[in-house]
Amino acid sequence: MNSSYTQRYALPKCIAISDYLFHRLNQLNIHTIFGLSGEFSMPLLDKLYNIPNLRWAGNSNELNAAYAADGYSRLKGLGCLITTFGVGELSAINGVAGSYAEHVGILHIVGMPPTSAQTKQLLLHHTLGNGDFTVFHRIASDVACYTTLIIDSELCADEVDKCIKKAWIEQRPVYMGMPVNQVNLPIESARLNTPLDLQLHKNDPDVEKEVISRILSFIYKSQNPAIIVDACTSRQNLIEETKELCNRLKFPVFVTPMGKGTVNETDPQFGGVFTGSISAPEVREVVDFADFIIVIGCMLSEFSTSTFHFQYKTKNCALLYSTSVKLKNATYPDLSIKLLLQKILANLDESKLSYQPSEQPSMMVPRPYPAGNVLLRQEWVWNEISHWFQPGDIIITETGASAFGVNQTRFPVNTLGISQALWGSVGYTMGACLGAEFAVQEINKDKFPATKHRVILFMGDGAFQLTVQELSTIVKWGLTPYIFVMNNQGYSVDRFLHHRSDASYYDIQPWNYLGLLRVFGCTNYETKKIITVGEFRSMISDPNFATNDKIRMIEIMLPPRDVPQALLDRWVVEKEQSKQVQEENENSSAVNTPTPEFQPLLKKNQVGY
């Protein structure tokens, strides 16, 4: 007979609410907690060590901790962040806001002053000095799907369960304030023997039936269809349903930049990355001439709509958002898309399909190899690195050139992409890399036979300088990511897009990047500085380099005014937009026109490199 949870952990009849909280996270296989300690959070953190499977990451600052919880959540379904009242939570709020914008489930627990001090409105440290202890809670409410304070002894266990469920199901941050004098509120441990109910709410059967009928009708009639997979496919755990739908329909499949890594890019139906009007010609051709388009996990950001200068030509579109569906001109709110897709799959009859499958053209166009002594360029690097990726890789790309360059790659099967294309907080990926490393460590341990996911980070030198402290935490835990520092001597994307390319605010202080691992006390590492095509080829062809048995930092030396092709394409859209502004206002001087040093680059990249 299987023992109950309380028996396995030999729990007494009553436990503290803080113990209960950590046991609930343990039950969901959430084993790493991120954050920084503080006077108001330390009593809570003491309880963390009562649960054998949990560990405290101990981040370098709260912002990086929020980034790490976000990266962890993208693989595990939920990230937990603990900060102290006021100064700590405000340091983290940028990262939490990013999780809200990008639909990532975070449980943010804030250690608060005792309720007695709050009632008396004492002028405690970490307050604004006005006796208002609710101000930070109010600030958090705008970047959380739910907020609460653990103050009622009769309801506190229900509140803990509610917070975890909301963060898990809605994939948005939840704010939980816990005063220091409430940490030991007694709770019956027997509640832990009943698992959390994480079932999605059932759809209205009549509405669901109508939506399914209309979508299937379009599917059966369509002769030139397309499927576009967007960000919320991974956020709402729709990957398996999407995979089955693509396999059975055999429609042409595309991903948005935020959806990259959610479908099998080695499948013959995969056609590439859809970025609105700046998509590759072969992608535009399919989408523009489609008579029916399904967008799964829809998030209409500027990166998938060419800065909102693109609309689907066909009106026969099924836009499947996180919790609603737009079908032509009709909107159906309050729908679970996961349950809807499952019902569509259950009712799908492939014999009724009108579409005749055809293989999509390869997005990887063979290019002549430059000589080995040729200096590296973005365009060549991003095309070449695809050959080094392996199934199961976690590929993280920073806001900037890397976020555009990765769209030129083709991922192997079961590869996940992590980026922050919508919120775009520069420096996010160092913390996200830490969180992803913790997550894959736990996933590898839980799987049999064991897998060995590699975590690969591409980060510009400017972004690296913003959040470098978390490299110390990576070293502390002996984690083994690949960190590619794309050194183009400053903020090249901004330098390229803005009309003043020579402004000093693009520049940064040069660092000895490869010396930092030694500074942080690392002993198991490898560093490389790659300048030429030959050095790059030699590196990725080395079988030892392919094994993630140590932390590796690779500095890729690039020209300061060199950018990926996808960014050049975006510039064309920006130029047209600026031209329209100029026509509307002849006195306007803020026109994005490339300076002379970019003209040769435009011509060179347009013919390939």
From Swiss-Prot:
Its cofactor is Mg(2+); thiamine diphosphate. CDD domains: TPP_PDC_IPDC (cd02005), TPP_PYR_PDC_IPDC_like (cd07038). GO terms for cellular component: cytosol; nucleus. It is found in: Nucleus. Fusel oils are important flavor and aroma compounds in yeast-fermented products contributing to the quality of beverages and food. In low concentration they are generally desirable, whereas high concentrations may spoil the product. By adjusting growth conditions and substrate their production is sought to be influenced. Its main location: nucleus. The keyword Electron transport does not apply. Keywords: Branched-chain amino acid catabolism, Decarboxylase, Lyase, Magnesium, Metal-binding, Nucleus, Thiamine pyrophosphate. Pathway: Amino-acid degradation; Ehrlich pathway. One of its GO terms (molecular function) is branched-chain-2-oxoacid decarboxylase activity. The keyword Magnesium applies. GO terms for biological process: amino acid catabolic process via Ehrlich pathway; branched-chain amino acid catabolic process; positive regulation of thiamine biosynthetic process; positive regulation of transcription by RNA polymerase II. Its EC number is 4.1.1.72. Binds 1 Mg(2+) per subunit. It comes from the Eukaryota. Residues 578-598 are annotated as: Disordered. InterPro entries: DHS-like_NAD/FAD-binding_dom, PDC/IPDC-like, THDP-binding, Thiamin_PyroP_enz_cen_dom, Thiamin_PyroP_enz_TPP-bd_dom, TPP_enzyme_TPP-bd, TPP_PDC_IPDC, TPP_PYR_PDC_IPDC-like. It catalyses: 4-methyl-2-oxopentanoate + H(+) = 3-methylbutanal + CO2; (S)-3-methyl-2-oxopentanoate + H(+) = 2-methylbutanal + CO2. One of five 2-oxo acid decarboxylases (PDC1, PDC5, PDC6, ARO10, and THI3) involved in amino acid catabolism. The enzyme catalyzes the decarboxylation of amino acids, which, in a first step, have been transaminated to the corresponding 2-oxo acids (alpha-keto-acids). In a third step, the resulting aldehydes are reduced to alcohols, collectively referred to as fusel oils or alcohols. Belongs to the TPP enzyme family. Present with 2140 molecules/cell in log phase SD medium. This is Thiamine metabolism regulatory protein THI3. It comes from Saccharomyces cerevisiae (strain ATCC 204508 / S288c).
